[in-house]
Amino acid sequence: MIKRVNWLEIKVTDIKKAINFYRDVLGLKIKNEWPNYAIFDLAGTLVLAIMTGGKKGQKEGAPNVYMAVDNVDEEYEKLKAKGVNFVEPPKKQYWGGYATLFADPDENLFYLTQTKD
């Protein structure tokens, strides 16, 4: 039986640019780094790895990745001020949540979502 998803890899075109985005812009803690690969810890629950070999642009069939935050509107404003490319402003989602959609430098898409704990 599958217990949980614990590792997520995202392909990027420029590892240094991607590390800067995920570490310095999004504030993720880097665990390890190699010339073509880097690993970030997401609150001890999931590992996000970035690796070279990607092509720019959203890939058909790519999974949606949701990152939970305490306040979507606050994070939206902070990240927007840092130049993050938001595809969709914060809004109520059809599934009942509240979220915003942004892209990394390689146009991989991510949601910031606010949930009730």
Task: Enumerate the language-model features and the residues they cover.
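Amphipathic alpha-helical segments
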Residues: 16-29
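Conserved short beta-strand elements that form part of the metal-binding/catalytic scaffold
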Residues: 29-62, 109-114
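N-terminal beta-strand motif that seeds the catalytic metal site of vicinal oxygen chelate
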Residues: 1-17, 63-65, 116-117
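Short amphipathic alpha-helices within nucleic acid-binding modules
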Residues: 21, 73-78
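Vicinal oxygen chelate
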Residues: 76, 80-117
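Conserved catalytic-core motifs of GNAT/GCN5-like acyltransferases
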Residues: 9, 29-34, 91-93
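Short beta-strand micro-motifs in enzyme catalytic cores
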Residues: 38, 63, 96-100
